Amino acid sequence: MPERNGFMANLTYDKKEIESVIDKIVKRTMRMDLTWDWPGGVAYYGVCEAYAATGNKEYIELLKDRIDEYIELGLPSWTVNTCAMGHAMLSLYEYSGDEKYLDIAKSKIDYIENEALRFGDNVLQHTVSVNNDFPEQCWADTLFMAAFFLLRAGVMLKDEALIDDALNQYYWHIKYLQDPATGLFYHGYNNITKDHMSGFFWGRANAWAAYTMSEVGRTLPECYLYPKFLDIVGSLNEQLASIKLLQTEDGLFRTILDDPDSYEEISASCGIAAAMINKGNPLHIKYINKATAGILKNVSEDGRVLNVSGGTAVMKDRDGYRGISRDWIQGWGQGLALAYFSKILNYDKIRSDGAL
């Protein structure tokens, strides 16, 4: 009989290599001319994760200087997408104690709670501008840009109303977007036409869903006392059990997950694999190790995360998704890669049995 020593299989990686790759990605990310919009929000979330994992204050100080420059230049109008930068505001406040960062985070919260367009049971409509671009549509992207941010803020501020709103967003995005037959997430849902529009299982949508769901239990104290958390657990379990089978031989995931002719996409691969680390199920370790090898091959010597698809609306057809360029450096690719590699470094601290 195997010995019960409390030890489970571990990840396979070179710590110095991962730290070096993180350093390269952070430095290259901070050379990008990102702004208050979601590319910066995801990128700088990753920089904050890198600081938390490595303890390298250079990373958070570089970010602090950049954000201070942004603040001096003035604040834009908020949308769901621009609320992604709220993650960095919370992290900078935790680091520095400077109320100006918390004040900006609170202004984003005020927008979400009092101005953002909603439909149905207070479900956030995905917005990318001050215009009503996508009437009564929910997108998986909103889970990262707004719901996860609201959850973090609610926990930090001990505000149960924010926590409840965040969990409500998760609950309804699961109900609207997850396919019960496959466990995979559609990119978007149109509440007016009552359909998923073109109806594809877009890779990055599944990364947004998986990653943010996997963070709930690690963010919310006594999460098991919130009924909607159990829906999140069930949803993530179903999704990861299905999605692991779609991993390619190179350890990656495709831009349309179940389309063998779609290209392998790195931001989706990072978000999905990071969710597996967070989940802690030992059955996923072999998939995580395979992903690490594949993702490392897609980071250039100067810290660019390669083969990341450009900004993607809910496209009209399969070719629309296949045709999105992956030639350029993207903030979300940098940020999700940093989040993934940071999870690897923190694995011994966050490992669990995957139960919740």
State what each model feature region is.
Residues 210-257:
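Oxyanion-binding "anion nests"
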Residues 96, 153-164, 216-230, 279-283:
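Inter-helical turn/loop segments and adjacent helix faces that build the functional surface
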Residues 66-67, 124-132, 188-193, 252-261:
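Short linear capping/connector segments at secondary-structure termini
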Residues 6-39, 48-58, 69, 76-88, ...:
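CBM-like carbohydrate-recognition segments
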Residues 123-189:
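Aromatic- and glycine-enriched pocket-lining scaffold segments that form the walls
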Residues 184-204:
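Acidic/Ser/Thr-rich, low-complexity mid-to-C-terminal regulatory regions of eukaryotic proteins
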Residues 35, 138-145, 158, 162-165, ...:
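Short, contiguous, pocket-lining structural segments
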